[in-house]
Design a protein with these regions (language model features):
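Acidic/His- and Gly-rich active-site-bordering loop/insert found
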Residues: 1-90, 95, 99, 103-115
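Histidine/acidic-residue-rich, glycine-tolerant segments that coordinate divalent metal ions
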Residues: 51-52, 71-73, 79-89, 96, ...
């Protein structure tokens, strides 16, 4: 079987069995098994999910990183390898990232004796929940690493092409939560209440001025309001 065929099969297996952030136990076992079969060394970091492998010898170390978690989304695609886990799917392509990194590991293993140093391969959990990188850092996975490289699939590019540039490329993410307290009233007598819906709607619009007025126009920033809901009544 060719490397391409192997990676396609692995990607489809991962796609069929997606796991949410910090729940990627079966995914980790699959990756571990595939790496063991290729005689790739796995480093003994204490991680609940995710793993770190290493190829090569020497003092110099660089790292390659891929994310492995999925999203809480129901898959609607009608393909033979669609998700078998209700309400969970690899909607962001982390099955692709993991397969690509496995392919890199296999190719690097074939050239291990010619490498001028070590390549540390990070399979990061919990990218979607914004905490997985910290678990690797706290475990010591980046000790002595001089540089780290990652990638993300880009459906807008033609197959077989990749893009890069100097400077920042992909973003760091921060979350914010706002709570707006109002006072209920009859729809025909809004003056007797405090309309939280109106205020929230205005706030969403005003927040967009942060990107256009508070940030240097030469810097890249995106501010999105992803969800608006009312408190559940007990």
């Amino acid at each position: 079987m060719t490397l391409s065929s192997t990676l396609i099969n692995w990607r489809r297996e991962l796609h069929q069995h997606p796991e949410l952030s910090l729940q990627e136990e079966a995914t980790t076992r699959r990756i571990q098994g595939w790496l063991h079969a290729a005689d790739v060394d796995i480093l003994p970091f204490e991680l609940k999910t995710g793993l770190v492998a290493e190829i090569g010898k020497g003092e110099d170390v660089i790292a390659l990183r891929a994310d492995i978690d999925a999203l809480p989304i129901e898959e609607s695609a009608d393909v033979p390898f669609r998700s078998l886990t209700p309400g969970v799917m690899h909607a962001c392509g982390h099955d692709v990232h993991t397969s690509v990194m496995l392919g890199a590991a296999l190719l690097l293993k074939q050239q291990e004796t010619t490498l001028p140093g070590r390549v540390r391969i990070l399979f990061q959990p919990a990218e979607e929940s914004f905490g997985g990188a910290k678990t690797l850092i706290r475990a010591g996975a980046l000790q002595n690493v001089a540089a780290i490289f990652g990638m993300h699939n880009e459906p807008g590019l033609p197959v077989g092409e990749f893009a890069t540039r100097g400077g920042a490329f992909y973003a760091n993410v921060d979350r914010f939560v706002l709570r707006i307290n109002g006072k209920g009233a009859h729809a025909a007598r809004p003056h007797e209440g405090k309309d939280a819906i109106l205020l929230a709607s205005q706030l969403v619009t005003v927040l967009q001025s942060v990107a256009s007025r508070d940030v240097n126009t030469l810097d890249s920033v995106v501010l999105s309001v992803d969800r608006k809901s009312t408190r559940l009544n007990s």
